[in-house]
């Protein structure tokens, strides 16, 4: 049906991305692009204009400095969204905990973007050329991000407030049993409020975020890739430039 066809096309696209001819490191224009989707209904409704104004648990995503807006009690943010007619699913959850007289805040965020039930058609065609749909199995392609946030007020006066914050983020990406990657990166942000004016700055991937990919194929899968003139991928590193 049409849905399975869409998933099959998605599978071919994903596998194509995983087939570098040799091991190397390179900057990708759209590396870890799932981290740019957004978080929270308010942030998305405002066109992502949250860096200066965010002051709840979702600040771990938009600008960790905004976590200092969470006072007295912990704050939780949850979000679920679906894309491409429900084929891709996006989940977001975050927690902010104020500590030390509301001057410091700890935060944790979890993001997941995934396409589930992708048909694996590597063994659809038998050696004799016949088609065997019983050989088609499903797999998932999922991207995860774990954000550990810290924010602190460095000035808290009636006419001027300044907060700073940072994220340490761990990336995990998995495509069935074929490929997986671990990555690490840092973000930093600042919020300044002076009377009725608010200014926010957010720097992502300030140390350059990397994903270290590893691949695992059975001998049968390698044979199919070889016979169909596809390269067998090996370990590589994907880099995300600061922005």
Predicted region positions:
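Bacterial Sec-dependent N-terminal signal peptides
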Residues: 1-29
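Short strand-turn segments of transmembrane beta-barrel domains in outer membranes
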Residues: 48-51, 75-85
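N-terminal, post-signal-peptide region of Sec/Tat-exported proteins
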Residues: 53-76
């Amino acid at each position: 049906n049409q849905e399975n066809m869409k998933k099959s096309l998605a599978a071919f696209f994903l596998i194509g991305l995983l087939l570098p001819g040799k091991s190397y490191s390179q900057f990708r224009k759209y590396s870890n692009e799932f981290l740019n989707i957004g978080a929270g209904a308010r942030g998305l409704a405002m066109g992502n204009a949250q860096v200066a104004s965010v002051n709840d648990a979702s600040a771990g995503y938009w600008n960790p400095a905004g976590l200092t807006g969470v006072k007295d009690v912990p704050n939780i943010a949850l979000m679920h969204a679906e894309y491409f007619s429900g084929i891709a699913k996006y989940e977001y959850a975050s927690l902010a905990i104020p500590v030390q007289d509301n001057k410091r805040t700890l935060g944790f965020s979890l993001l997941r973007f995934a396409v589930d039930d992708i048909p694996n058609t590597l063994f659809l065609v038998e050696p004799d050329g016949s088609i065997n749909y019983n050989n088609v199995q499903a797999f998932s392609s999922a991207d995860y991000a774990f954000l550990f946030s810290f924010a602190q007020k460095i000035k808290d006066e009636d006419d001027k407030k300044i907060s700073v914050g940072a994220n340490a983020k761990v990336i995990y990406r998995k495509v069935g049993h074929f490929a997986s990657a671990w990555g690490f990166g840092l973000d930093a942000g600042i919020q300044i409020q002076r009377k009725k004016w608010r200014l926010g700055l957010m720097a992502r991937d300030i140390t350059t975020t990397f994903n270290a990919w590893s691949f695992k194929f059975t001998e049968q899968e390698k044979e199919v890739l070889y016979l169909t003139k596809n390269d067998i991928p090996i370990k590589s590193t994907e880099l995300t430039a600061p922005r």
